[in-house]
């Protein structure tokens, strides 16, 4: 009996240590990544500005919902803004905006108008608007995830409008 108790304690101790080191790694990773969300910003007003720009540029608007608190949000942003191929697709087809959702600013007016798929799917989540501001699609990121990041090919298909 003591042997089984000792084994159980060792396993629990290892799980706690792994959990703590994993949490510490995420905190360190978040500290190194750019923070693209602006909690002080009026999201709906910014989207309205982007619609005017999208009409001029003949582009869609890709809205990434999340916050600087979300490591997966930061990972996605980092991938699409640092990978040359993904960045080129993003810049050619979209105006890219980070709509903040956090305790400091839940952007309730923007979500009242467009919905918040993050509440259903988790964060980040995406809204795709046409150049007139009409909602074309909502998207979760779960199907683009890989271990500790995103699958570049799946993200590319998403940006090209081919990920189903």
Protein language model regions, located:
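Bacterial Sec-dependent N-terminal signal peptides
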Residues: 1-24
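The canonical Cys-X-X-Cys-His
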Residues: 70-73, 126
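Typically the conserved alpha-helix immediately C-terminal to a functionally engaged Cys/Sec
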Residues: 74-89
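Structured helix-beta-strand junction loops
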Residues: 7, 57-58, 92-93
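N-proximal helix/coil linker or "cap" segments that precede and/or mark the start of modular domains
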Residues: 20-41
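Short active-site neighborhood of thiol/selenol oxidoreductases, capturing the structured segment around
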Residues: 57-71
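A short beta-strand-turn-helix
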Residues: 41-61
């Amino acid at each position: 009996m003591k042997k089984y108790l000792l084994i159980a304690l060792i396993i629990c101790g290892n799980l706690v240590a792994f959990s703590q080191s994993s949490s510490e790694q995420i905190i360190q990773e978040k500290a190194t990544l750019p923070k693209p969300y602006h909690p002080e910003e009026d999201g709906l007003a910014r989207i309205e500005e982007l619609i005017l720009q999208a009409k001029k540029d003949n582009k869609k608007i890709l809205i990434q919902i999340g916050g600087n608190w979300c490591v997966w949000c930061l990972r996605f942003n980092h991938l699409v803004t640092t990978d040359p191929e993904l960045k080129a697709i993003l810049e050619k087809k979209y105006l890219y905006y980070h709509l903040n959702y956090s305790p400091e600013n839940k952007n309730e007016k923007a979500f009242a108008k467009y919905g918040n798929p993050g509440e259903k799917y988790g964060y980040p989540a995406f809204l795709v608007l046409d150049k007139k501001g009409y909602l074309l699609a909502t998207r979760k990121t779960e199907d683009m995830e890989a271990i500790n990041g995103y699958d570049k090919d799946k993200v590319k298909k998403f940006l090209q409008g081919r990920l189903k």
